[in-house]
Amino acid sequence: MRKVMLAEKAGFCFGVKRAVDMALLTQKEYNKKIYTLGELIHNNDVVDKLKDNNVYPIGIEDIDNLKENDVILIRSHGISEEIYKILLSKGLTVINATCPFVTKIQEKVKKYNELGYDIVIVGDKYHPEVIGINGWCDNKAIISKQGENLENITSESKVCIVSQTTEKLENWEKVLKEVKNRAIEVISFNTICNATSERQKIAKDLSNKVDFMVVIGGKQSSNTTKLYEICKSNCNETIHVENSGEIPENILKNKNCVIGVTAGASTPDWIIEEAISKMSENQISNETNNEMADAMKFIAENEGKIYVGASVTGEIIQVSEKEVFLNINYKRDGVIPKSEIDDDGKDLKELFTVGDKIVAKIIKLKDADNYVVLSVKELQREQGYKEIKEAFENKTTLNVVVKEDVKGGIIASYKGIRIFIPASHVELFHVDNLKEYIGKSFDVAIIEYSTKKRQTKIVASRRALLSKEKEKVEETVWNKLEEGQVVEGEVKRLTDFGAFVEIEGVDGLLHVSEISWGRVEKPADVLKIGDKIKVYVLSVDKENKKLSLSVKKLTENPWNNVEEKYPVGSVVLGKVIRFADFGAFVKLEPGVDGLVHISEISHKRIAKPSDALNVGEEIKAKILEVSSEEKKIGLSIREVEE
């Protein structure tokens, strides 16, 4: 039984399809004969179909015969800079259908040629694409197919190397290796089109599995010829045909074989389908997908659906470093620049895959390269405004990312929409450095959403959410706090009258008098912000949200049994800790101080305590009196002096 297997990625590539669509569109717009500089693509059947639609190829020698305002279309292979300037100087209407990937190569060689680099092009020197590229570097490029013509490159050469988009990868690697062996400074751009390399790999794999391999495409088509060479190296029974009429009888009569089919980038679907149908012994249906008819049908059916602001669904047909190209079922393909997709610098080839469907918003009907310009960001923004308004009306939250700090607050982003957050709404406390929040994401509540003179003002608050969260936490903590509990807290603030200690989000006051049994002048003398300390809960006032704490309650009152510890008449050692006009205070133990009256300091008459004593001095004194109720101990230094 005969089996026909069609390779994936066979047929029209992105650049070729774009050129054909542009030719048909241009003819429709101008409604007169349109000229293409050279055959638009290397496929005789397509060229004939274009002629049927009043699109005719001419040679460079025919340019002088054109009249002002005649319309000429540059084919997908591109042309030299010199010829491009000639077309413009003649007053012609020039439509540039150069494949965008070829245009980028032209830009690269022009740039590096002007920077003094030797340009090397890997490819066929007679191919129109290579001729055109060479024309953008003053026709000075070294053209090498398999490593030849590189004799003038030396170790002192600065080289920029690019490739014909349809070149075989093995040729690129061979020439690149040779260039790097000769020159030290080499800038290389592998400009082989992804579609080309994928098509070649798939064709190579398929040719290993079949009895016959049929490669369909124009005999002048470079990429088709390379497909033939690749397949022929694996399958000896490989043939190159332009259409179904060239398929030989030995294949058609073989009833028991597997036939592989691939096609060059210039081969439309309807030619491929004719060939498959013939080899499969099926009649061609009247509903055969005709590439030309489809293109014209899309022009008619979708004209009214494409306008700035409309949302469209497209199928990804190509992904480059800077753009994503879509088939949007319209006379022009769509393009999404990277700037309209993502701000985070991600690789587009990691985000998108050829064949995926994507929805985007139209922001321009036609750019310089004749694409419909689309934006994912604008679609997200449109949806974002709806979600922000709903969040404002329903009092729900949104997660935003902080982008920059501005006067009076910060700017956050939600789906590309700027949202202002006042500085006073960032935290529950004052923030000195708002730059610390750049790049951070958090939930916010929308507190203002208004539109005036076509401008939308959006203000959000994080503090409102933090306040609600704090209230919930505090409510739980207040319900479990009781007098007499011992809990752990963190010192958050210090004042002259005490320290504020946070316990699971609730602030309590540790009064200066409750820090120690001894005298504390200032809380900062014994505590610092951030200290983790255990505290005793003195009182809990849930209604007024007041919490009183104590540290000294965690230790025994040193005045208990003081009469037994310090009997009257005993002599003790102590340290002078401070002076008063009437005497000196002496520390006997933590929390217990005694007073030496000025009259009990010395046998000599002194005007003030500091005349005889120094703060920090160790002294010996006699206990004159003790009162635990009044917390007083009277001392005398004079009575122990000899």
Swiss-Prot record:
Residues 1-282 are annotated as: 4-hydroxy-3-methylbut-2-enyl diphosphate reductase. Its EC number is 1.17.7.4. It catalyses: isopentenyl diphosphate + 2 oxidized [2Fe-2S]-[ferredoxin] + H2O = (2E)-4-hydroxy-3-methylbut-2-enyl diphosphate + 2 reduced [2Fe-2S]-[ferredoxin] + 2 H(+); dimethylallyl diphosphate + 2 oxidized [2Fe-2S]-[ferredoxin] + H2O = (2E)-4-hydroxy-3-methylbut-2-enyl diphosphate + 2 reduced [2Fe-2S]-[ferredoxin] + 2 H(+). It comes from Clostridium acetobutylicum (strain ATCC 824 / DSM 792 / JCM 1419 / IAM 19013 / LMG 5710 / NBRC 13948 / NRRL B-527 / VKM B-1787 / 2291 / W). Pathway: Isoprenoid biosynthesis; dimethylallyl diphosphate biosynthesis; dimethylallyl diphosphate from (2E)-4-hydroxy-3-methylbutenyl diphosphate: step 1/1; Isoprenoid biosynthesis; isopentenyl diphosphate biosynthesis via DXP pathway; isopentenyl diphosphate from 1-deoxy-D-xylulose 5-phosphate: step 6/6. InterPro entries: LytB/IspH, NA-bd_OB-fold, Ribosomal_protein_S1-like, S1_domain. The active site is at E129. Coiled coil: none annotated. Its cofactor is [4Fe-4S] cluster. (2E)-4-hydroxy-3-methylbut-2-enyl diphosphate binds at H42, H77, H127, T165, S221, S222, N223, S266. Dimethylallyl diphosphate binds at H42, H77, H127, S221, S222, N223, S266. Residues 309-377, 484-552, 569-638 form the S1 motif domain. Binds 1 [4Fe-4S] cluster per subunit. This is 4-hydroxy-3-methylbut-2-enyl diphosphate reductase. Isopentenyl diphosphate binds at H42, H77, H127, S221, S222, N223, S266. Gene3D superfamilies: 3.40.50.11270, 4-hydroxy-3-methylbut-2-enyl diphosphate reductase, catalytic domain (3.40.1010.20), Nucleic acid-binding proteins (2.40.50.140). GO terms for molecular function: 4 iron, 4 sulfur cluster binding; 4-hydroxy-3-methylbut-2-enyl diphosphate reductase activity; metal ion binding; nucleic acid binding. It is an enzyme of class 1 (oxidoreductase). The keyword Cell inner membrane does not apply. [4Fe-4S] cluster binds at C13, C99, C193. GO terms for biological process: dimethylallyl diphosphate biosynthetic process; isopentenyl diphosphate biosynthetic process, methylerythritol 4-phosphate pathway; terpenoid biosynthetic process. In the N-terminal section; belongs to the IspH family. PANTHER family: 4-HYDROXY-3-METHYLBUT-2-ENYL DIPHOSPHATE REDUCTASE.
